[in-house]
């Protein structure tokens, strides 16, 4: 990291490498994919991300997801203050990035890649969920609290786990 990065006494001047980009699209996101993507973006380009923010529709949630960040600091949460998605309102995602040497197309593609996936399983299906090892479970709910699945593990405790992303790393078809 540049040693002058946090020097508040330094002169600040912006050149033509500093730009902003915004994007809006209809649809809903998987918040777990979003957090993973933002984390990667901060690690790789955080020094050049001066400011970023957005209001997003997350699958399985009525509240709007509001996020903002400065460089490598990121915060995001569901906000009832901003408002809930109203019945019939088009659920959409909007974001703005301000920074140096931004690649608008890559930022758009990164956010679009976080869209909520079409689920492979339905309520009541038997699956194997990864809880450190793959363990037999039953899908209790789809799109619960922003997660693709809530699974009841089929053991004595009947504990519930959320599956953050619908792929074979997290959940597999049962026999």
Question: What is each residue range found by the language model?
Answer:
Residues 135-143:
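Short beta-strand-centered aromatic/proline hotspots
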Residues 119-120, 155-175:
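Intrinsically disordered, low-complexity, charged/polar segments
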Residues 147-152:
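Short aromatic-glycine-enriched beta-strand elements
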Residues 1-93, 102-105, 109-119:
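C-terminal accessory "lid"/substrate-recognition subdomains
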Residues 119-131:
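Short coil-to-beta transition motif at edge beta-strands of beta-rich domains
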Residues 64-70, 138-139, 161-167:
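Short amphipathic beta-strand/extended segments with alternating polar/hydrophobic composition
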Residues 97:
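Flexible loop/N-cap segments at domain edges
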Residues 131, 143-146:
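A generic structural motif
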């Amino acid at each position: 990291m540049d040693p002058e990065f946090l020097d508040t006494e330094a002169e600040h001047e912006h050149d033509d490498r500093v730009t902003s980009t915004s994007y809006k699209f209809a649809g809903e996101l998987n918040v777990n994919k979003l957090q993973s993507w933002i984390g990667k973006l901060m690690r790789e380009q955080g020094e050049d991300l001066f400011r970023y923010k957005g209001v997003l529709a997350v699958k399985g949630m009525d509240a709007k997801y509001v996020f903002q960040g400065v460089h490598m600091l990121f915060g995001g949460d569901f906000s009832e203050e901003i408002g809930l998605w109203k019945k019939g309102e088009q659920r959409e995602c909007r974001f703005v990035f301000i920074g140096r040497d931004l690649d608008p197309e890559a930022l758009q593609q990164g956010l679009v890649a976080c869209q909520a996936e079409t689920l492979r399983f339905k309520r009541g299906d038997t699956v194997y969920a990864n809880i450190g090892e793959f363990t037999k479970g039953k899908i209790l709910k789809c799109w619960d609290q922003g997660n693709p699945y809530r699974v009841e593990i089929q053991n004595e405790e009947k504990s519930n786990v959320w599956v953050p992303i619908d792929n074979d790393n997290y959940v597999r078809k049962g026999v």
